[in-house]
A protein has these predicted regions:
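Conserved nucleotide-binding/hydrolysis micro-motifs of P-loop NTPases
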Residues: 33-34, 60-64, 113-115, 144-149, ...
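Conserved Walker B catalytic segment
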Residues: 25, 95, 101-141, 153-154
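Walker A/P-loop
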Residues: 37-53
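A short, basic N-terminal segment
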Residues: 1-22
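Conserved alpha-helical scaffold flanking the Walker A/P-loop in AAA+ ATPase domains
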Residues: 15-18, 84-100
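Walker A/P-loop nucleotide-binding motif
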Residues: 22-42
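Helix-loop-helix "sensor" segment of P-loop NTPases
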Residues: 96-100, 150-211, 215-217
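Conserved NTP-binding/hydrolysis module of P-loop NTPases
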Residues: 51-54, 62-81
Length: 223
């Protein structure tokens, strides 16, 4: 089905395109159910697999050693149980891929608000944030607004200073609610005038910025 391109969707898509092209670090935040993950997946799925290595992490309660294992496996490196060996292997491989310009590596972390501080600190060490001005891959963090509290920690200042793109979702306006509902109805071959004009204001008031809640309200209205 065709995705509805809201202002938030377009803003996040454009910013994702920019940081992927510039090998930057992006943070995208919103309340639950506003479409961040959908937008992230749509962008990642559109990338050429012969050009990009995409590492998608959603199990964000992982430990530091789990994090290294995931990166190690995704990069096709030698298996080892030693954290120090994995660290060196991953760092060298990222540098090699960058210097030879063979592949672009993207690490995308979803539900970032649950990410352990120890894992974020590993990002700092792995990427040489304290000493090196060069970025070896694109880092994308998508999560709820609470992630900001973690980013404000003093120990994460080197990481925070390197973030070059951030966006917080604003949610649908009333006109977008109508356009979204009409597009949903059309996608299932329903008449686009099933809802009266005043219904859109009610839906807008009840959805509380959540597209997920809006979908539930639409479905219940049609039963």
């Amino acid at each position: 089905s065709t995705l509805y391109a809201s202002n938030d969707f377009n803003q996040m898509t454009n910013r994702l395109d920019f940081i992927i092209r510039s090998r930057g670090i992006g943070v995208f935040l919103s309340s639950p159910g506003m479409g961040k993950t959908t937008c992230l997946r749509k962008t990642l799925e559109s990338l050429n697999p012969n050009r990009y290595v995409v590492i998608y992490i959603c199990m964000t309660t992982i430990t530091a050693i789990d994090f290294y294992r995931m990166l190690n496996d995704a990069l096709g490196l030698e298996e080892t149980t030693k954290k120090s060996q994995m660290f060196n292997q991953i760092q060298e491989e990222l540098k090699r891929l960058t210097s030879e310009n063979k592949m672009e590596v993207i690490i995308a972390v979803d539900e970032a608000q649950f990410l352990r501080k120890e894992v974020l600190r590993e990002f700092i060490m792995l990427m040489n944030f304290d000493y090196d001005s060069k970025d070896y891959c694109t880092l994308i963090f998508v999560g709820q607004n609470e992630f900001l509290r973690t980013l404000r920690l003093k120990s994460l200042e080197p990481f925070r200073q390197r973030i070059n793109m951030n966006y917080t979702f604003t949610g649908f306006n009333e006109e977008e609610v109508k356009n979204y509902v009409v597009s949903r109805l059309k996608s299932v071959n329903c008449r686009s005038d099933l809802f009266k004009e005043e219904c859109y204001h009610t839906l807008y008031s009840l959805m509380n910025t959540s597209v997920r809640i809006l979908n539930l309200l639409i479905n219940k209205s049609l039963i």
